[in-house]
């Protein structure tokens, strides 16, 4: 067969897309077309910040039907989403309540309990995963302690992409790359850790053994009656994005830039040393047995919130105004947990500057400048930290995802990090999703083979560091501006 048609369902924390890929195996050309785009946003339910997954499922099915109605024979479907959040099911496979978002405050103080009762080094030794207050381990503990009446009804817990695959196929699956984000998978066995799971109060029977990317979960029956395989792709969106990052060699790092920024490198072995623990490095699962050694950064969430609060719709115009402002006048620590979900992001940023005796950003452009400069400096700090961890410097940084379209931030990143930046592809998560599908269909050999296809089909933009820029001169003296209770503990 010369042509393959694969559908990627890519759900982010603010929007979702159903994308159609067309792959010409003879010429190794790959094209993407957006079929359906929809909004994903939080809603308040019984005092909790929850996801409207019934609406999301409706949009997923609508997008799939649009493809089928075009007369296209779909070869496979894959679903990727953000990590850590889950859906509860009863014995009949029906949903128990709505899934609570990781941004809900129900986990406040829970991680501190775990550090005392289990021990930080013991949790890290078992999981190899960074300490974030909203990890699934702490969400489940909050659930079992705060809502025991709900817990009694639960028979299964599915992570978000696994839930939507279940709704399409009727088959349950627990995909490995996303499962590792829970901080509940044992890094040595690739299975759920009994000790960590027991601490949450959840039952091990809620979960099946994690499966690695590439297996067929089941079939979705389209309106025309065709049975279409649903593939377990690397269902954590960052895992998919890394698959599509055209990393040149072992000296290349990646930055998946979107609502979250995730900076790291690929490794065939995990890093779980005391140094890695002190730096709060995570070892999330990747495809083909590789590890995504990385750190989480709050990312463009801060900007997204400012845009929403200020009702700004012309982002290019705002960036142009921002570029004209001097650098490094307003600096914050983007990873301060005060920015996870404040009532007013603009006011929170201003308060952080005021508390550190800095000028206070007032205009929208000043707020954006504060966010961009602060992110670039944090990128530089973390890249240096990652290089020290592995004992070898990086020579190139690949920025992928929606954030790679921000030329100003890309250049600031290159200047602050002091290395060449390659930006693109934008649709990295979708492409990585498609890549695993094509491997499952025996159209491609492995991840490296797929990266060659990506490099041949998608243009990258190069940013050369300017050592004389304001932000480059500032790097050496950058420190978070006050003692913060950080997101990355």
Curated annotation (Swiss-Prot):
Q: Which cofactor does it need?
A: Mg(2+)
Example of a GO MF term:
ATP binding
Q: Which UniProt keywords apply?
A: ATP-binding, Disulfide bond, Kinase, Magnesium, Nucleotide-binding, Rhamnose metabolism, Transferase
Residues the record marks as active site: 237
| Pathways per UniProt | Carbohydrate degradation; L-rhamnose degradation; glycerone phosphate from L-rhamnose: step 2/3
Origin superkingdom: Bacteria
Q: Which residues bind substrate?
A: 83, 236-238, 296
Q: Which family does it belong to?
A: Belongs to the rhamnulokinase family.
Q: What is this protein called?
A: Rhamnulokinase
> What is the species of this protein?
Salmonella schwarzengrund (strain CVM19633)
């Amino acid at each position: 067969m010369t042509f393959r048609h694969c559908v990627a369902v890519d759900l982010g924390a603010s929007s979702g897309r159903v994308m159609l890929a067309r792959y010409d195996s003879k010429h190794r050309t790959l094209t993407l077309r957006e079929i359906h785009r929809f909004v994903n946003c939080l809603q308040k339910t019984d005092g909790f910040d929850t996801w409207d997954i019934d609406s999301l499922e409706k949009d997923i099915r609508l997008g799939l039907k649009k493809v089928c109605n075009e007369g296209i024979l779909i070869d496979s479907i894959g679903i990727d989403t953000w990590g850590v959040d889950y859906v509860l099911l009863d014995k009949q496979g029906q949903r128990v309540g709505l899934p609570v978002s990781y941004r809900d405050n129900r986990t406040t103080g829970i991680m501190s309990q775990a550090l005392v009762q289990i021990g930080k080094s013991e949790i890290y030794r078992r999981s190899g995963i960074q300490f974030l207050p909203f990890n699934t381990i702490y969400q489940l503990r909050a659930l079992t302690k705060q809502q025991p009446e709900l817990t009694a009804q639960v028979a299964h817990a599915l992570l978000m992409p696994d839930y939507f695959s279940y709704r399409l196929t009727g088959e349950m699956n627990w995909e490995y790359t996303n499962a590792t984000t829970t901080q509940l998978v044992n890094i040595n066995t690739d299975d759920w850790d009994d000790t960590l799971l027991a601490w949450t109060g959840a039952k091990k029977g809620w979960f099946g053994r994690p499966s690695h990317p590439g297996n067929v979960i089941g079939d979705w029956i389209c309106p025309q009656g065709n049975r279409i395989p649903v593939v377990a792709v690397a269902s954590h969106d960052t895992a998919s994005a890394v698959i599509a990052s055209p990393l040149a060699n072992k000296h290349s790092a990646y930055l998946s830039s979107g609502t979250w920024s995730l900076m790291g490198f690929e490794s065939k072995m995990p890093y779980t040393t005391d140094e890695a623990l002190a730096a709060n490095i995570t070892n999330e699962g990747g495809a083909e047995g590789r590890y995504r050694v990385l750190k989480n950064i709050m990312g463009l969430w801060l900007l997204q919130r400012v845009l929403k609060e200020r009702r700004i719709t012309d982002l290019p115009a705002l960036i142009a105004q921002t570029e004209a402002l001097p650098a490094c006048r307003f600096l914050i620590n983007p990873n301060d947990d005060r920015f996870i979900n404040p009532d007013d992001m603009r006011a929170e940023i201003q308060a952080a500057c005021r508390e550190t005796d800095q000028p206070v950003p007032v205009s929208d452009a000043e707020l954006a400048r504060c966010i961009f400069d602060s992110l670039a400096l944090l990128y530089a700090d973390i890249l240096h930290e990652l290089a020290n961890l592995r004992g070898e410097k990086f020579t190139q940084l690949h920025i992928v995802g929606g954030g790679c379209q921000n030329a100003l931030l890309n250049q600031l990143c290159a200047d602050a990090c002091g290395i060449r930046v390659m930006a693109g592809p934008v649709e990295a998560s979708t492409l990585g999703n498609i890549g695993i599908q094509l491997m499952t269909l025996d159209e491609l050999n492995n991840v490296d083979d797929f990266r060659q296809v990506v490099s041949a089909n998608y243009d990258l933009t190069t940013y050369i560091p300017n050592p004389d820029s304001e932000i480059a001169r500032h790097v050496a003296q950058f420190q978070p501006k006050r003692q913060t209770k950080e997101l990355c503990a």
